[in-house]
Amino acid sequence: RGGQCVRLLQGRFDAETVYGNDPGVILGRYRDLGARYVHVVDLDGARDGSQGNRAAIARLARAFADTAIQVGGGVRSRKVAAELLGLGVQRIVIGSVAVTQPAEARQWLEEFGPDRIVLAFDVRLDAGGTPRLTTHGWESQTEASLWDAVLTYQPHGAMHVLCTDVARDGALSGPNLALYTEAVRRFPKIQWQASGGVSCGADLVALAATGAAAVISGRALLENRIPAAELVPFLPNA
């Protein structure tokens, strides 16, 4: 956000922690440990669609051409999607468009290919335990369920789905293992990316056991809560 490396607590822009002025330093640290993929979120873009961090993303893509970068936040038009992929970004993450403009998102899947598109569904559990979708930087909640959303895209070749339990994001409270276990059970052909709540190496082991293909961790890594010896075995795979 604003060119800095930051984390929000549960998607709240008034609960921001700054971890550094140069995201490249942090990305380099992960690359040197053996990370094949790095997940980057343009929080300004996620909030209002602005592209003020585009230059920073371009620098990361150039400087770390040997590391695949997936970028989300504010990818709300075909023009922005194509420009990001043109910068050397390996995958783009689409959230609000996937929820509110499914026809547009399906066109991107067909045009850019399912391996270049990650469908991001940020969820809050309702009183009955059903994961309901949120949009626009987690500030708007819908009545649509995660399961219905994935069903919409599966016939169109969707391959990668990133699911974040918003209530756990940045809280170091442990991931929602039941959510990802159920996601893999319902849609075993989807490459699920689990996000939210990771706090230690044991969480990575537990998430791997759910069948999730990848795990996204922010705060736990930025605060060095996962020792390198526990982290490195997972990096070549996700």
PLM segments and residue spans:
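Charged helix-capping and loop-helix junction motifs
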Residues: 51-58, 141-147, 173-181
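N-terminal beta-alpha supersecondary unit
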Residues: 5-51
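Glycine-rich, proline-tolerant flexible connector loops at the mouths of alpha/beta enzymes
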Residues: 37-56, 96, 163-173
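Short, acidic/polar
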Residues: 19-31, 76-82, 142-152, 204
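Catalytic cores of alpha/beta
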Residues: 62-92, 103, 178-217
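C-terminal helical cap(s) of enzyme catalytic domains, especially alpha/beta-barrels
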Residues: 104-112, 204-238
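Conserved, mostly hydrophobic/aromatic
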Residues: 30, 38, 84, 119, ...
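Conserved anion-binding
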Residues: 1-16, 85, 89-169
